Amino acid sequence: MGAIDSFCGDGILGEYLDYFILSVPLLLLLTRYVASGLVYVLTALFYSFVLAAYIWFVIVGRAFSTAYAFVLLAAFLLLVMRMIVGMMPRLRSIFNHRQLVVADFVDTPSGPVPIPRSTTQVVVRGNGYTAVGNKLVDGVKTITSAGRLFSKRTAATAYKLQ
């Protein structure tokens, strides 16, 4: 394959580097859900640097296989799009990460109202709160019928899950 061979000579390195460049997108797509996220991201970044250097050499350098570089560029762009789509929910959950508190009762102006576990639970978003039995702990005072959580540290919203 022309570009790497002209860069590395006609030796073994050029041949294996070509096969590496062609096989890594397939390997990344196959191992996307097997490997950990960090391994996936590091492999994709390493591959992107190798591919960027390769395409730069093909387009700017003295190689003749420009069409080959554009095929690799298209494969790389598909890989990047797939990686972005795959990472967006994770990034969103990292930035919006809050622990969930599940309560079995709601305090209303007329008194605490129990919520059967079989039908509905009130899930409260808050930082570091926990539920023990029917009591909310870690600074949570009460959940009102309006669905607002009042605590010493912050206020969060209670959601009913059907």
UniProtKB/Swiss-Prot annotation:
Residues 1-10, 62-67 are virion surface. Coiled coil: none annotated. Residues 32-40, 89-162 are intravirion. Keywords: Disulfide bond, Host membrane, Membrane, Transmembrane, Transmembrane helix, Viral envelope protein, Virion. The keyword Disulfide bond applies. It is found in: Virion membrane; Host membrane. Pfam families: Arteri_Gl. One of its GO terms (cellular component) is virion membrane. The chain crosses the membrane at residues 11-31, 41-61, 68-88. InterPro entries: Arteri_GP5. It is a multi-pass membrane protein. The keyword Disulfide bond applies. Major envelope protein. Heterodimer with glycoprotein 5; disulfide-linked. This heterodimerization is required for transport to the Golgi complex. Belongs to the arteriviridae membrane protein family. This is Membrane protein.
